Amino acid sequence: MPSYTVTVATGSQWFAGTDDYIYLSLIGSAGCSEKHLLDKAFYNDFERGAVDSYDVTVDEELGEIQLVRIEKRKYWLHDDWYLKYITLKTPTDYIEFPCYRWITGEGEIVLRDGRAKLARDDQIHILKQHRRKELEARQKQYRWMEWNPGFPLSIDAKCHKDLPRDIQFDSEKGVDFVLNYSKAMENLFINRFMHMFQSSWNDFADFEKIFVKISNTISERVKNHWQEDLMFGYQFLNGCNPVLIKRCRELPQKLPVTTEMVECSLERHLSLEQEVQEGNIFIVDYELLDGIDANKTDPCTHQFLAAPICLLYKNLANKIVPIAIQLNQAPGEKNPIFLPSDAKYDWLLAKIWVRSSDFHVHQTITHLLCTHLVSEVFGIAMYRQLPAVHPIFKLLVAHVRFTIAINTKAREQLICEYGLFDKANATGGGGHVQMVQRAVQDLTYSSLCFPEAIKARGMDSTEDIPYYFYRDDGLLVWEAIQSFTSEVVSIYYEDDQVVMEDQELQDFVKDVYVYGMRGRKASGFPKSIKSREKLSEYLTVVIFTASAQHAAVNFGQYDWCSWIPNAPPTMRAPPATAKGVVTIEQIVATLPDRGRSCWHLGAVWALSQFQENELFLGMYPEEHFIEKPVKEAMTRFRKNLEAIVNVIAERNKNKKLPYYYLSPDRIPNSVAI
């Protein structure tokens, strides 16, 4: 009678263990065993973090083991169990069966060995059937839903507990936005102000009552220098929204600025048109905000939005500084162009309006749409179309970890009607929805390809723009990811023909196009992939968006937005329509009140924190891959990332404003906050 040694590993997260009965069946090429109860006398099996071994003897020859079936039956109360993996020592072999899934209720799970396989590799009927049944079950669990008209489709779940257990957070309490924001305000000692809506601050210094002063930090430097043009310009390159600035190839007609108006800012003694031709003029246009409805959820507080155009100049020191700001799109007598030569407070308020507009576009488009929602689309499509044995599933699963869950919590508490977003933001109350609906029309595949996106904005020259660290570090990380994905692709796809014939892969790509991009041809998202090179690029887009891009635009929020005048989430008076009338009192009365300031501060603090036990780029503790060539590729990937960490650390030495958001040791694997 054949005898097997079965090793069972239970997860180490909270509540991973179980007291339920666990049964195991072995399915081989020659037959299926009876189910065996895995139990040791006087021993507490399947405790959290435990690795337990059992001897299993079967009555007949099973042939080569193909599958392992695990069944969980209730002992007292239903007790979910997180199974990491099973190993099987047979008379002639040693087989690993990765799982990394929850078994809930009176459930069962059927596992394949850990070798990654394309559909063409499965010749045995039982394996083909297992593959098909897994996808059929997943497609019933992971359903598309339209949360708002025009949005990329999201998961069909009203709240976190409705999600499949495998993609829920280990502890929902840890990602409760209401709890976390309130806790953040308590930790920042600002909760005494959190209900003081309609109560204005007295002056700029008064904002220090809610500012946590930590020496030698970016946030402190922002507080001390936020009014300076150099600091204003620097943020377009290396702040938390470094994706909008582009080289100005032609002055737009809607911004009728002349050489005479900006002459005192031009250091090369050239006309404005000549500076444009020389490539020294840059522009940031917030046209997306034009006509967006401002927040009206609080009848006691009027809130306002602008749609500014900001012209910037590269001076002789190669630094970017603002030279002209128009606060709305249509030129006219009541929409003056503000200049550095204007009265101090005229110019300052114009810059504050730009910073406020930048905050809105950052939160809703750069952050929410282009990382969170896009990554969720990739995640849902992956679960629907790629079985766990598929190499692309094994590659991507770490990079969609908790993404669907965090987005579901956001729809439940944060960006829903009367959610937390409405409390402090001028684009709350529906404006943020309008913004996404507009921006989706311009979302393209090439905008997610980092090198292409940088080049399209004319920002690719390191000689012309030497202080664009977001670009420099992003390209290093992109190249490291692309090198890694190319290696993995070459292991499983020997030529382009294999890529084209992988129907599961093609269905995954098609799902993203049809449901994520809503079948919009102008998006440029591929409907299919026809080469190994294009597959590697596509996988790099998925991983880079979920990891590096999200890190770049998320984890600097407290640094750059905690000083309220530098990133006001709302404005309580409309943009100035004339020059020479702005006073310091008017600026303070325009900035957010005490209550909204506190909710904003709690939000940017909470969103900027890493998760407990965060997994950073290159960390793959769940061993979905067992093959040596892939593990060697992972090792090379980690070494490349470590080299990038060292390059960035060396550059940042002695810098007053270090840029570290794209250092791989600070880039989480996935969008999970």
Curated annotation (Swiss-Prot):
Coiled-coil region list: none
Modified residues (Phosphoserine): S271, S523
Subcellular location field: Cytoplasm; Nucleus matrix; Nucleus membrane; Cytoplasm, Perinuclear region
Co-factor(s): Fe cation
PTM entry text: Serine phosphorylation by MAPKAPK2 is stimulated by arachidonic acid. Phosphorylation on Ser-523 by PKA has an inhibitory effect. Phosphorylation on Ser-271 prevents export from the nucleus. Phosphorylation at Ser-523 is stimulated by 8-bromo-3',5'-cyclic AMP or prostaglandin E2.
UniProt pathway annotation: Lipid metabolism; leukotriene A4 biosynthesis
Catalysed reaction equations from the record: (5Z,8Z,11Z,14Z)-eicosatetraenoate + O2 = leukotriene A4 + H2O; 18-HEPE + O2 = (5S)-hydroperoxy-18-hydroxy-(7E,9E,11Z,14Z,16E)-eicosapentaenoate; (18R)-hydroxy-(5Z,8Z,11Z,14Z,16E)-eicosapentaenoate + O2 = (5S)-hydroperoxy-(18R)-hydroxy-(6E,8Z,11Z,14Z,16E)-eicosapentaenoate; (18S)-hydroxy-(5Z,8Z,11Z,14Z,16E)-eicosapentaenoate + O2 = (5S)-hydroperoxy-(18S)-hydroxy-(6E,8Z,11Z,14Z,16E)-eicosapentaenoate
Residues noted as binding Ca(2+) 1 in the record, renumbered to the chain: G17, D79, D80
EC numbers for this chain: 1.13.11.-, 1.13.11.34
Function of the protein: Catalyzes the oxygenation of arachidonate to 5-hydroperoxyeicosatetraenoate (5-HPETE) followed by the dehydration to 5,6- epoxyeicosatetraenoate (Leukotriene A4/LTA4), the first two steps in the biosynthesis of leukotrienes, which are potent mediators of inflammation. Also catalyzes the oxygenation of arachidonate into 8-hydroperoxyicosatetraenoate (8-HPETE) and 12-hydroperoxyicosatetraenoate (12-HPETE). Displays lipoxin synthase activity being able to convert (15S)-HETE into a conjugate tetraene.
Known partners and oligomeric status: Homodimer. Interacts with ALOX5AP and LTC4S. Interacts with COTL1, the interaction is required for stability and efficient catalytic activity. Interacts with PIK3R1; this interaction bridges ALOX5 with CD40 after CD40 ligation in B cells and leads to the production of reactive oxygen species (ROS). Interacts (via PLAT domain) with DICER1 (via Dicer dsRNA-binding fold domain); this interaction enhances arachidonate 5-lipoxygenase activity and modifies the miRNA precursor processing activity of DICER1.
Designated name of the protein: Polyunsaturated fatty acid 5-lipoxygenase
Organism: Mesocricetus auratus (Golden hamster)
Taxonomic lineage: Eukaryota, Metazoa, Chordata, Craniata, Vertebrata
Protein's gene: ALOX5
